[in-house]
Amino acid sequence: MFKQIILFSFLLCSAQFFAQDEEESTSKFCVEIDNKKALKLYEKAIDKKKYKKPERLAFLRECLEIEPDFAEANLAMAREIIVHCKLESKPFAPAVPFLLKAIAVCPKIHSEPYYYIGFNFYEETKNDSAIKYLQQFVKFKDDDDKKYAKEYEGQLYQAKEMIKYAKKESELKKKIVPFAPKVVTGVSTKTDEYLAYISPDDKLCFFTRKVPLKSMNTVKAIDGERELFMVANRDNTGVFNSGEAMSPPFNTTEDNQGGCTISIDNKFLYFAMSRFEGGSQPNCDIYVSQNDEDTWSEISKIGANVNHPVYWDSQPTLSSDGNTLYFASDRPGGYGGIDIYITKKDPKTKIWGVPQNAGPKINTDGNEKTPFIHSDSETLYFSSDGHFGFGGMDIFLIRKNDKGEWIEAENIGYPINTEVDDVGFFVSTDSKTGYFFSYDEGKMRGKGIGKYDLYSFELYKEARPQETTFLKGEIKDNSGNNIEGAKVEITNTVTKEKTLAVVDSSTGKFMVAVNLKKKDDLLLTVKKDDYSFSSKVISVKDASFKNEPTPVKIEINEAKEGSSFVLNNLYYTTNSADLTKESFIVLESFAEYLKENPNIKIEIQGHTDNIGVVKSNEALSANRAYTVKAFLEEKGVSGKNITAKGYGPNKPIAANTNEEGRSKNRRTEILIISK
């Protein structure tokens, strides 16, 4: 993007140079020329009134054959070439040898040769040479005003900009990052595959494949081929099969479908689709389909709030909790041509809100597209030609700080990024593998199977998102029945950050992405109207949690008068009524529950095992119950709705003959008095 901007500015700033006659130059030659024939030929070559361009060029060529070190003749030849190249919109590299000869013979001949030589090297991405000559242009000093173009100030500004960006690019290229891409077999074939995406569980790969039109008569693509929306499965050895066309309602019309994202439970597929809706051009919007027992529901638009009725909306990527969607759009009101937008879903109504621009940390006056939000929920990858890069679209990453604010976008580095467009990048859930699709005749020359293929590589550590795994579980009642329509809230016990799990409303099964960098314990709280409070603390410190965490089972029952439940993970210091810090988060969550259900009246019951004196245990259990009552009142729960009582060892729920039974008996129980 920067090169294009500077090139355009160059065309504007160079007009005076092209219009400038050689007669305006200093009348004295830098080096005395004794050859009269060469002098005569030069005089003819600069006489634009008498001779046409072909004749002048012939005079210059003959002049330089006689006197190759004739500085002014070399400069005149360079000017003629530059004028021609400008008119033909071609690089003016052919003029560089003449400019170099001119300044080699006469360094002070004119300021502009340094500018054009530097610009040419800048355009060719020969940054060291570009910096060298552009700096000479900036430092050029002479009392003769004729040695400066009328547009010198504009050229000076452009030269300084080119120096700045050339230095930045050189610094980026010196920091070469590890990059050893290999083609993803199975998915990649001799035909084109692109717009790929691998599901968060790493088992499914969605992509678009071009196939010969032949016996097909729908979903046409250019070159007599058809675009199919495909899905491939990964086997136990980690290899994808070649894939098959997505079943109906996909691939049934001429509407192009692809560029998708899917919820972590593989149930909700969001994708872009381009279709004609009455206008002369197809409109690209974001759609959704739900999977129920391997059957996809009818396709529907994500919502009127999200899709613009006229402009392009595409390339969705979904957060791990399923409630935030990032996408690219060229709608008006942004920072540039294509911007990244964010829309959030109301957990209650399930309606997507009005999209908000992702802001200037991400979007520029250029174009930003193909966003990918990792399951860690704090690392976003996207492609941009507005942030500083190597040329075309480069891949960038940006992270959130502890306050949830975006920090600064970083170029992912060379040679992952090159002078060509680098787009469609995403990262595996475990953070270790990067994926992208690329044209084999570009930077992947010779490594592909077809033209456009999917590639993978080990992503270097500094560019990785936070390592993430998925915690799964299910909600049941005390009879083992599935609970429908419940919510599962996950709270970090240290930061208090809250996340909603993705819950299957019909089965009660849930799934949530867990950031493994934060080794803090997690509090899982189940919420459902007219049901009792239920929570469980999960430790992520165990090494086995990294791979496939054991599914969590949480029990929740109807909140009936006379029913009771245990407050799990509530601990006190030994022989004391003082709560441990780990218990605070549980009681804070319980306080929220009581405030959300202000009509419930409870009795807090303290219980102990049978070790020790009965009277002492009764007193200890009562003190603990009152400690809980005081904590809840401090958090805003009405004291009128709470009573507290200690029962000591008198109401065991397990045998006191072993430690396992005794630990169950040491508990804080909640009795629902009325609701």
Task: Give the location of each predicted region.
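TPR-adjacent "capping" and linker segments in tetratricopeptide-repeat scaffold/adaptor proteins
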Residues: 21-40, 106
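Short, conserved micro-motifs composed of acidic
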Residues: 30-36, 109-112, 116, 123, ...
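Alpha-helical segment of the N-proximal tetratricopeptide repeat
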Residues: 34-66, 82-90
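Short coil turns that delineate tetratricopeptide repeat
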Residues: 68, 107-108, 142, 598
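Periplasmic OmpA-like peptidoglycan-binding domain that tethers envelope proteins to the cell wall
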Residues: 384, 388-389, 597, 605-675
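Periplasmic peptidoglycan-binding/tethering modules of Gram-negative envelope proteins
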Residues: 462-489, 493-601, 675
